[in-house]
Amino acid sequence: MDGNHNKFWSLALSIAMMLTATAASAVEENFDALKPGTLPDDWTCGVTGKGSPVWKVETDTSAPSKPNVLKQTGSGTFPWCVKQLVRITDGFVEVKFKPLGGREDQAGGLVWRFKDGDTYYIARANALENNVSLYHVEKGRRITIKYVHAPVTTNQWHTLRVEFSGKAINVIFDGKRYLGLENDQITGAGAVGVWTKADSVTAFDDFSYGGQ
């Protein structure tokens, strides 16, 4: 009995230490200390494919953490904005986003294991299609892994989170896990960031990430 008791507490302590370490490594950015019309110095923005995306910090009175958000108002095949100097192999990335408009798409997404504009993973939610999707990009080509129906509302804040470890990928939207699977197309450390598609006008806030 004592042996089992000790094993239980040893396991509980190990789990607590793991959770503490993960929480300690988490970083959150809300863009509120930045001047509207600017970009954070440590973010790099671009596009996979063609187009002219426009990323900048703007004031938004509806922001989950007021007053500022990071907003994409231009258009391009797949616009992205990443924390280029962050390198995470296994961990999580999360953001609150609000799809504001777009005739072709109204998407907000996350990227991780981002090597460059041609190689990375994407999880995204789309208000026009009402779904959550998982992709990987290789040689600049977006490849669908899986998508599922999900209620995504325009002009409403949503939370998108991805947890990734080895081959395992879990995509959580508004607190519910919609995708849980294994994929090993992209391995090793990479940057993390946010993503849109086509003419999506999307606001982002409370971007957070952490490594295991």
Residue ranges and their predicted role:
Residues S10-T20:
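Bacterial N-terminal signal peptides
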Residues S25-V47, D205:
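Extracellular carbohydrate-recognition regions
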Residues N30, I186-Q212:
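Ligand-recognition surfaces built from glycine- and aromatic
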Residues F31, V93-V95, N155-V171:
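Short tryptophan-centered beta-strand motifs in secreted/extracellular beta-sheet-rich domains
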Residues P36, Q72-S133, E138:
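Secretory/extracellular carbohydrate-interaction modules
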Residues T38-V69, G76-T77:
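Extracellular glycan-recognition surfaces and repeat-rich motifs
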Residues E138-T159:
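Short, aromatic/His-centered strand-loop micro-motif at the edge of beta-sheets
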